[in-house]
């Protein structure tokens, strides 16, 4: 990942370009109320607010929320925009009622450009950056604590599952060996361990893949997404759309499978012998295949390269 170009002046100041914005606007064109579960810099939300849509923006990162509130203060003061500090996987804990419903719900998963560009947050493998990677204050451990305490077998499984790393066992063994001499504290420590296993020709793509795997574990991202999907589905109004942008194959697989299951003619549990759902699907998948960014957008915003957008409509 690299910093992306600033937004044009027509988008409320200088901010990073939101990914797949035109596609999101098209899919949620009929929405009058939107829940932005990953508010970040507020780029997607700003576009909805400019159209007169009422938006509730959620983010687990206090800094991101504060920046978005400053950017969108005019809309917040008018009552059109509401900002909530929360993890989208635990909205009830933030005071959301089970009756809160939305015409559109958006998730833009992964790290925001603001988080990545701030080296002090520890999401980057820049020289000297701390091993933090926490998206919010609700994470139990930062990346350094995780790498310094996790069992070697569990670390190997983590790297295999989240980074598709064929040398996961060897890399886990190298990390454990190094931390016994000196605890991991900065990005350099992890980069050196990766190079020791993958060789001197390893580079940014390898580092990004391993760092992403550690970040996913620190923030419990895949488990959180899996828990959140049915809960967010149930917050849609009839005909409402759930749109999700993912950047990791594990995320995309969870979303694809959930949308497929919800669109099936029978949604009863597999071990239930008698159908009680009356053979009616919960809704339909709008995107038969994931939507990717155009080459033009990728040229303007490199973060869009790995983005995959899927959308589902409630019955």
UniProtKB/Swiss-Prot annotation:
Physiological role: Specifically methylates the N4 position of cytidine in position 1402 (C1402) of 16S rRNA.
GO CC terms in record: cytoplasm
InterPro entries linked to this entry: RsmH, SAM-dep_MeTrfase_MraW_recog, SAM-dependent_MTases_sf
Protein name: Ribosomal RNA small subunit methyltransferase H
UniProt-listed Enzyme Commission number(s): 2.1.1.199
GO molecular function: rRNA (cytosine-N4-)-methyltransferase activity
Main location: cytoplasm
Keywords: Cytoplasm, Methyltransferase, rRNA processing, S-adenosyl-L-methionine, Transferase
Localisation: Cytoplasm
Reactions accelerated catalytically: cytidine(1402) in 16S rRNA + S-adenosyl-L-methionine = N(4)-methylcytidine(1402) in 16S rRNA + S-adenosyl-L-homocysteine + H(+)
Enzyme type, top EC level: transferase
């Amino acid at each position: 990942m690299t910093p992306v170009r600033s937004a044009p002046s027509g988008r409320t100041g200088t901010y990073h370009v939101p990914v797949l914005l035109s596609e999101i606007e098209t899919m949620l064109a009929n929405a009058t109320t939107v829940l932005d579960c990953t508010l970040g810099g507020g780029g997607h939300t700003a576009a909805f607010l400019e159209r007169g849509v009422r938006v509730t923006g959620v983010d687990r990162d206090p800094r991101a929320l504060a920046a978005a509130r400053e950017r969108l203060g005019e809309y917040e003061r008018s009552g059109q925009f509401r900002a909530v500090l929360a993890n989208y996987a635990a909205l009830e804990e933030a005071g959301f009622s089970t009756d809160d419903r939305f015409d559109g719900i958006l998730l833009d998963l992964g790290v925001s450009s603001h988080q990545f560009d701030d080296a002090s947050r520890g999401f980057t493998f820049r020289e000297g950056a701390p091993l933090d990677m926490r998206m919010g204050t609700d994470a139990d451990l930062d990346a350094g604590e995780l790498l310094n305490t996790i069992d070697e077998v569990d670390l190997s499984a983590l790297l295999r599952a989240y980074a598709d790393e064929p040398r996961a066992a060897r890399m886990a063994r190298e990390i454990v060996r190094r931390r016994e001499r000196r605890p991991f504290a900065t990005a350099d420590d992890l980069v050196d361990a990766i190079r020791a296993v993958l060789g001197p020709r390893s580079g940014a793509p390898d580092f990004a893949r391993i760092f992403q795997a550690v970040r996913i574990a620190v923030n419990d991202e895949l488990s959180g997404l899996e828990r959140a999907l049915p809960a967010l589905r149930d917050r849609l109004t009839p005909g409402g759309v759930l749109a999700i942008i993912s950047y990791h194959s594990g995320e995309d697989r969870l979303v694809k499978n959930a949308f497929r299951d919800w669109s099936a003619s029978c949604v009863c549990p597999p071990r239930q012998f008698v159908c009680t759902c009356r053979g009616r699907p919960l809704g339909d998948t709008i995107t038969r295949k994931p939507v990717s960014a155009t080459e033009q957008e990728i040229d303007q915003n490199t973060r869009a390269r790995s983005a995959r957008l899927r959308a589902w409509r409630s019955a």
